[in-house]
Amino acid sequence: MKMTFCRAVCLAAAFLLMGCDEAPETTTASPAAQVLEGKTMGTLWRVSVVGIDAKRAAELQTKIQTQLDADDWLLSTYKNDSALMRFNHSRSLAPWPVSEAMADIVTSALRIGAKTDGAMDITVGPLVNLWGFGPDRQPLHIPTPAQIDAAKAKTGLQHLQVIDRAGHQFLQKDLPDLYVDLSTVGEGYAADHLARLMEQEGIARYLVSVGGALSSRGMNAQGQPWRVAIQKPTDRENAVQAIVDINGHGISTSGSYRNYYELDGKRVSHVIDPQTGRPIEHNLVSVTVIAPTALEADGWDTGLMVLGTQKAQEVVRREGLAVFMIMKEGEGFKTWMSPQFKTFLVSDKN
């Protein structure tokens, strides 16, 4: 069995968004910018900051890593003692106390899930694990229909709710085996959280990324808007499809072309359709979303990726989203963008 995963290569200054939610690459050097980086949530984080010295940068590096470690402890499905996994391990159907951050993340995810007709489903964890993209080991054979049905029976957004009681936040499930997986929005939340840290530190010019989710404010070291390149879905890591000015927004890309494995002679995508219980097999290979927050962009790109081209376009038009799609067509690719996305577009390489 052959496994191929996303790997990030980081350079400096203007970040390159790569599919399957991996960490971005930079495209040009910028000696006036302090570039900090590290690891979190099984991926890479990167922060480019203008206007601070090396001493301040070293202090900021520590604060960033500490905050991201706390975010990972909150959201991880790989740490058995994380806040999320304690909820998952519990079979109690009573309201479960959680932090305000956890409640906000789940609320946003449930909202996007409803607007994508359940395609963005944070309860799909049993299916993700069954297909080998969670903490469990990869299967030796394609799961049987019975195994898929058994896993699907443990999923469903209707089985999870967020409760606010006099300012205290709770999650409640009505299935004891419900398993919540927030990896589809975790990177976006962490990127937004880093942006808030920059604001708290009085930093007005920054670009932050966690995996494939980014957020920015102000101008880069050259006094120009932060620009992000969307990669072509090929094996060439520096092949650029489009360039956008995210203008203080969040951006995230989801793709099916790098995070996969081969099993029984078939390519198995990490993107699981909650309706079928199986990895997606349609021709939509990359979705980029620009939204007010990186968390929203991170959630929307997953849901749209699951839906496939036609259904995703219907949702994009209905919700007025800024979206760029790349579809496989024969031996090549074709692209589509919403009118809202065009307002951010600097260059399209078609």
Swiss-Prot record:
Binding site for Mg(2+): T184, D298, D301, T302
Reported cofactor(s): Mg(2+)
Compartment annotation: Cell inner membrane
Phenotype seen when the gene is deleted: Cells lacking this gene are conditional thiamine auxotrophs, and display phenotypic behaviors similar to those of strains lacking isc (iron-sulfur [Fe-S] cluster biosynthesis) operon functions.
Lipidated residue numbers (S-diacylglycerol cysteine): C20
Membrane topology: Lipid-anchor
Entry-linked Pfam families: ApbE (PF02424)
Keyword annotations of the record: Cell inner membrane, Cell membrane, FAD, Flavoprotein, Lipoprotein, Magnesium, Membrane, Metal-binding, Palmitate, Signal, Transferase
EC number, as in UniProt: 2.7.1.180
Catalytic activity: L-threonyl-[protein] + FAD = FMN-L-threonyl-[protein] + AMP + H(+)
PROSITE patterns listed in its UniProt record: PROKAR_LIPOPROTEIN (PS51257)
Positions of FAD binding: M41, Y78, A119, M120, D121, D181, E187, I272
Function in brief: Flavin transferase that catalyzes the transfer of the FMN moiety of FAD and its covalent binding to the hydroxyl group of a threonine residue in a target flavoprotein such as NqrB and NqrC, two subunits of the NQR complex.
Family: Belongs to the ApbE family.
Name listed for the protein in its UniProt record: FAD:protein FMN transferase
Organism: Salmonella typhimurium (strain LT2 / SGSC1412 / ATCC 700720)
